[in-house]
């Protein structure tokens, strides 16, 4: 997904370049030039909750009483004010003269600071909560910069799923005294899909809250990295204006996968300083044009509070770091070897559950489960003949089998939301590749596990079918029936809804 769909690209003052002092030094002439130039690029995360509210209540946005009843006085008033400003013919966007970007000088909140009216680099305009207005205009506009709320919601839910299953368990190994570490909720698939509901930040809306955290982390990280790109342009002999506009052109060409954003958010969260995080993220962002393996290995530097050393395999082309958690070992690896899913790697590290692909390297995450006291673990699995039956699970197959149920729920929840029209379940031809890639990015370990002896697990089979939609029309029909059967209850994962899904899976196996 491209940057302009994921975020608002705005103009800010030169204070954004403050992070460069820690990278280049306080006396750097480049840093002084940029701060004096006093124009920078800031990436602002879209508020997905507001976007969905705007879209779902499009017919009533001018009804103050109704909006206040639905969302409370503060939120309701904010929505109505944003809508009325967006419809006002006299509404004037504050635009940066240098870049043509929307101005976003941060004051005490998300609106413009009072300094914006006096800033020489920007068109004069009255301070107001401009971000809500711009989000509303994008949510309701036809064409142009219209945000496809279905796809962007699905994208962020995929990012959330990857982050909470791959990276957040590792945060327990970070220094407990660090102020950068925050309480991150694990995925709770038995609760309703809060991502597609409103912006009420309480315990029952943990998914949306986590999406806000991830989008903010990503925006902060990208903003910091952009400042280093501008500094680099300046060293190439360009002036400040040209440097800024060159970076802006580059920024608008970027695309991201959910797994890459999850990785960037994790690095930004756990790195000791913003400056160090920016350098590390640079290794990730620039990997597509560089095969400098030592630079890419830097993303492995912060795995635990003991700063476990990065180790190399015998071939010298694979670096890894492992963290043990009782009967589970998490291993992050970077390799230049294209055959990263070989038996040699699996035997050493366990089940491959996440892949971030670069042009010259692969970032991999493995999980290995060790049976207690050398015994085989058993779990319950739904069956069409018996409601529950005991299935023997080997260490190699335990991860995909245990998580297949949640993966199916996640995937169907994402998939159903992409096609909200209950009267039609026809998948557009140009959506096949996008759907397949999204599912593959969320659950890359499924294909690697298809040879394991776990085919009797109906959830796992449905997930495999989901990942091969474009190859087999029979699988398409099966999943289509599943979605149609579940459509009325898929958003509210009550016990009844879960029972319906279990029945659907057993019936359409």
From Swiss-Prot:
Native source organism of the sequence: Rice dwarf virus (isolate Akita)
Summary of the function given for this chain in its UniProt record: Transports viral genome to neighboring plant cells directly through plasmosdesmata, without any budding. The movement protein allows efficient cell to cell propagation, by bypassing the host cell wall barrier. Increases virus accumulation and symptom severity.
Name of protein: Movement protein
Broad class of where this protein is predominantly found: host cell
Gene Ontology BP annotations: transport of virus in host, cell to cell
Swiss-Prot/TrEMBL keywords: Host cell junction, Host cytoplasm, Transport, Viral movement protein
Signal peptide positions on this chain: none
Subcellular compartments: Host cell junction, Host plasmodesma; Host cytoplasm
Top-rank taxon, per record: Viruses
GO cellular component: host cell cytoplasm; host cell plasmodesma
């Amino acid at each position: 997904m491209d940057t302009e769909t994921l975020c608002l690209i705005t103009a800010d003052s030169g204070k954004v370049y403050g992070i460069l002092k820690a990278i280049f030094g306080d006396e750097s002439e480049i840093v002084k030039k940029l701060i004096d130039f006093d124009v920078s690029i800031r990436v602002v995360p879209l508020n997905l909750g507001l976007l969905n509210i705007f879209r779902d209540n499009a017919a009533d946005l001018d009804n103050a009483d109704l909006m206040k009843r639905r969302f409370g006085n503060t939120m309701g008033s904010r929505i109505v004010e944003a809508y009325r400003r967006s419809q006002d013919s006299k509404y004037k966007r504050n635009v940066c003269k240098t870049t043509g970007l929307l101005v976003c000088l941060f004051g005490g909140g998300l609106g413009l600071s009072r300094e914006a009216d006096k800033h020489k680099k920007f068109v004069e305009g009255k301070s107001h909560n401009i971000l809500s207005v711009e989000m509303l205009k994008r949510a309701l506009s036809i064409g142009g910069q219209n945000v496809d709320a279905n796809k962007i919601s699905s994208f962020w839910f995929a990012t959330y799923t990857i982050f909470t299953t791959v990276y957040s368990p590792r945060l327990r190994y970070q220094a407990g005294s660090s102020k950068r570490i925050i309480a991150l909720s694990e995925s709770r698939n038995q609760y309703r899909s809060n991502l597609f509901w409103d912006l009420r930040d309480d315990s029952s809306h943990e998914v949306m809250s986590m999406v806000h955290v991830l989008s903010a982390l990503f925006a902060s990280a990208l903003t910091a990295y952009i400042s280093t790109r501008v500094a680099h342009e300046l060293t190439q002999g360009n002036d400040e204006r040209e440097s800024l506009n060159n970076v802006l052109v580059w920024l608008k060409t970027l695309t991201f996968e959910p797994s890459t954003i999850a990785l960037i958010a994790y690095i930004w969260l756990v790195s000791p300083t913003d400056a160090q995080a920016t350098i590390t993220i640079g290794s990730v962002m620039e990997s597509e044009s560089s095969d400098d393996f030592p630079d890419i290995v830097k993303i492995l530097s912060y795995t635990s509070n003991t700063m476990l050393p990065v180790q190399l395999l015998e071939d010298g082309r694979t670096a890894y770091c492992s963290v043990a958690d009782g009967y589970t070992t998490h291993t992050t690896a970077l390799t230049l070897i294209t055959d990263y899913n070989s038996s040699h790697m699996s035997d050493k590290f366990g089940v491959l559950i996440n892949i971030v692909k670069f042009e010259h390297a692969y970032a991999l995450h493995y999980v290995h489960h060790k049976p207690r006291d050398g015994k085989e673990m058993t779990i319950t699995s739904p069956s069409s003949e018996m409601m529950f039956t005991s299935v023997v699970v080997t260490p190699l197959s335990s991860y995909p089998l245990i998580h297949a149920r949640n993966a199916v729920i996640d995937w169907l929840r994402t998939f159903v939301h992409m096609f909200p029209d209950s009267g039609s379940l026809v998948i557009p031809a140009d959506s096949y590749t996008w759907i397949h890639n999204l599912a593959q990015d969320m659950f890359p370990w499924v294909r690697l596990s298809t040879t394991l002896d776990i085919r009797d697990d109906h959830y796992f089979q449905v997930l495999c079918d989901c990942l091969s939609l474009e190859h087999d029309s029979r699988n398409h029909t099966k999943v289509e029936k599943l979605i149609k059967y579940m459509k009325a209850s898929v958003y509210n994962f009550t016990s009844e809804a879960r029972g319906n899904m279990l029945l659907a899976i057993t019936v359409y196996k």
